[in-house]
Amino acid sequence: MIPLQHGLILSAILFVLGLTGLVIRRNLLFMLIGLEIMINASALAFVVAGSYWGQTDGQVMYILAISLAAAEASIGLALLLQLHRRRQNLNIDSVSEMRG
């Protein structure tokens, strides 16, 4: 069994990597991938904590987080597809410009 500290450190590293990808990248698709990594890192923390204390609540929260991530990914990808059809790119700087 993995110690609690190792699992939480791994989860924190994954969360920071996702946050870094979210902040540094300018492409919306890569920003969405970074957000997915952050959601999965928090779900991993729930599973590790639940396993450490012998509770099944961590696994239930993992299922909830995965369903949330699936809904977020499907809506995000649909919006990205529409944005790509209208603007022909996914750069965040071109999206934030106002017309007029």
Swiss-Prot record:
Keywords (A to Z) from UniProt: Cell inner membrane, Cell membrane, Membrane, NAD, Quinone, Translocase, Transmembrane, Transmembrane helix, Transport, Ubiquinone
One Gene Ontology term of the molecular function aspect: NADH:ubiquinone reductase (non-electrogenic) activity
Cellular location(s): Cell inner membrane
Taxonomic superkingdom: Bacteria
An annotated GO BP: ATP synthesis coupled electron transport
Annotated coiled-coil segments of the chain: none
Its membrane topology: Multi-pass membrane protein
EC number: 7.1.1.-
Protein family: Belongs to the complex I subunit 4L family.
Name of this chain's protein: NADH-quinone oxidoreductase subunit K
Organism: Shigella boydii serotype 18 (strain CDC 3083-94 / BS512)
